[in-house]
From Swiss-Prot:
Superkingdom of the source species: Eukaryota
Gene name linked to the record: YOP1
GO biological process, one term: endoplasmic reticulum tubular network membrane organization
Sequence ranges on the Lumenal membrane side: 56-57, 106-108
Lineage, opening ranks: Eukaryota, Fungi, Dikarya, Ascomycota, Saccharomycotina
Oligomer status and interactors: Oligomer.
Protein name, as recorded: Protein YOP1
GO CC terms in record: cell division site; cortical endoplasmic reticulum; endoplasmic reticulum membrane; Golgi membrane; nuclear envelope
UniProt free text on domains: The short lumenal loops between transmembrane domains 1 and 2 and between transmembrane domains 3 and 4 may impart a wedge-like configuration, thus deforming membranes.
Function in brief: Required to generate and maintain the structure of the tubular endoplasmic reticulum network and the vacuole. Induces high curvature in membranes and causes membrane tubule formation. Involved in membrane/vesicle trafficking.
Length: 189
């Protein structure tokens, strides 16, 4: 066992000697008291974990756990509180989450080639799902709401039905203005 440890330490020393060529690593080693070889091995290990997260179904599974379980738990808690702020936070989250999933569904063939996609997606879902960041509201106001207003005609203080009702009433009023006095249009208010 001690032979293996000696061989590993010798290999790490050789790596340290090779890494002496890079001033950035030397500076990093001064700032944090960790040998350059450990920094490199940590980076390589982290790199392979990221690759692992993006291969097969495990990346998608971990991302969905972060996107469903954690906000789902907070949503259940929010339903039991008397205030409305946390309800709004998670209703906004679920709208953003659904929008992301629709986008992801239609672009999965492209997203497959994005390196570390599931890692970025997981970080994004945690950002929008955890209440301390308020990311869902920011993403909703910056992206989803303007898109929804264009596509679905959502008005700030009324739904699509209010807008349609106002348009219909405007059309009735315009039609009535063209009907001579004393004649009925057959439309009641």
């Amino acid at each position: 066992m001690s032979q293996i440890i000696d061989q590993v330490q010798a290999a790490l020393q050789n790596i340290d000697k090779e890494l002496e060529k890079y001033p950035a690593l030397k500076e990093l080693e001064k700032q944090i008291p960790v040998p350059k070889s450990y920094i490199l091995l940590g980076f390589v290990g982290f790199y392979f974990i990221l690759i692992f997260l993006n291969i097969g179904g495990i990346g998608q599974l971990l991302s969905n756990i972060a996107g469903l379980v954690i906000p789902g738990y907070y949503s259940l808690l929010a339903l039991e509180t008397p205030g409305k702020a946390d309800d709004t936070q998670y209703l906004t989250y679920w709208v953003v989450f659904a929008t992301l999933n629709v986008f992801e569904f239609w672009s999965k063939a492209i997203l497959y080639w994005v390196p570390f996609y599931y890692l970025f997606k997981t970080a994004f879902l945690l950002y929008i799902g955890l209440p301390q960041y308020g990311g869902a509201e920011l993403v909703y106001k910056a992206i989803v709401k303007p898109l929804a207003q264009k596509l679905v005609n959502i008005q700030p203080h009324g739904g699509p039905s209010d807008s349609l009702k106002a348009q219909a009433q405007s059309a009735v009023d315009a039609a009535e203005s063209h009907v001579p006095q004393g004649h009925s249009t057959g439309v009641s208010h």
